[in-house]
Curated annotation (Swiss-Prot):
Lineage: Bacteria, Bacillati, Bacillota, Clostridia, Eubacteriales
Name the UniProt record assigns to this protein: Acetoacetate decarboxylase
Function as written in the Swiss-Prot or TrEMBL entry: Catalyzes the conversion of acetoacetate to acetone and carbon dioxide.
Matching InterPro entries: Acetoacetate_decarboxylase (IPR010451), Acetoacetate_decarboxylase_bac (IPR023653), ADC_dom_sf (IPR023375)
Pfam families, per database record: ADC
Keyword Lyase: yes
EC number of this enzyme: 4.1.1.4
Entries under SUPFAM superfamilies matching the protein: Acetoacetate decarboxylase-like (SSF160104)
Catalytic reactions on record: acetoacetate + H(+) = acetone + CO2
């Protein structure tokens, strides 16, 4: 391979890259979202400045993605924390777990999604929508919601899916010193809502040292939604460079 061609490659291994080029379009992406109130002091310890908390809330989200351009079929879950940045409201992505190596690789390399490997599932059990996460062999999350009990306004569903996502991008140099340390923002685009519902929900978080979702305890369930949508991942943008701060 010519030297001039090396920088044109997307990632390694060159003969079989870990992921293809985007854009990444999701068809029939299915969400189970549960918003809950948690401990404010716990949130203050983990949400990085210059983001500001927008209440003492967390959104647990479970997403089944059966048809993703270039990445195939997989399931993902995690915690998102409502925040504000320069008066723009969005969500800080705290941690994410999924069962697809290309999606993990592209999320971490090409963007800043805090992704780790886990075993999430979203399924219907009798008349309940269930989201479950295992890390290794151990259960970490069980989320339940009544299956399509009440319709949710489609505009409200769109608003939930269209919120900006904030993430940290941290890469060390070969000397162990920070090489990249940035706050990133990305938004979903080309959103089509196919259906949306709400209803009663419950959420159990189990302590795990390497999947510490339970460090943000469930104090009160605020709301829940079940949304079917198509969308495209937007291009991430740097909104704050921590290494430029003196």
């Amino acid at each position: 391979m010519l030297e001039s061609e090396v920088s044109k490659q997307i990632t390694t291994p060159l003969a079989a890259p870990a992921f293809p080029r985007g854009p990444y379009r999701f068809h029939n992406r299915e969400y189970l979202n549960i918003i809950y109130r948690t401990d404010l002091d716990a949130l203050r310890k983990i949400v990085p400045e210059p983001l500001e908390l927008d209440g003492a809330y967390v959104r647990f989200e479970m997403m089944a993605m059966p048809d993703t351009t270039g990445l195939g079929s997989y399931t993902e879950c995690g915690q998102a924390i409502p925040v504000k940045y320069n008066e723009v409201k969005g969500d800080y992505l705290h941690m994410m777990y999924l069962d697809n190596e290309p999606a993990i690789a592209v999320g971490r390399e090409s963007s800043a999604y805090p992704k780790k490997f886990g075993y999430p599932k979203l399924f219907v059990d009798s008349d309940a929508l269930v989201g479950a996460l295992k890390y290794g062999a151990l259960p970490v999350v069980t989320a339940t919601m009544g299956y399509k009990h009440e319709p949710l306004d489609l505009k409200e569903a769109y608003t939930q899916i269209a919120r900006p996502n904030f993430m940290l991008k941290i890469i060390q140099g070969y000397d162990g010193k920070p090489r990249i340390c940035e706050l990133i923002c990305a938004e979903n685009t080309d959103i089509t809502i196919h259906g949306a519902w709400t209803g009663s929900a419950r959420l159990q978080l189990f302590s795990h040292a390497l999947a510490p979702l339970a460090d943000l305890p469930v104090l009160e369930i605020v709301s829940a939604s079940h949304i079917l949508t198509d969308l495209t991942l937007g291009t991430p943008k740097v909104v704050h460079d921590y290494l430029s701060v003196k």
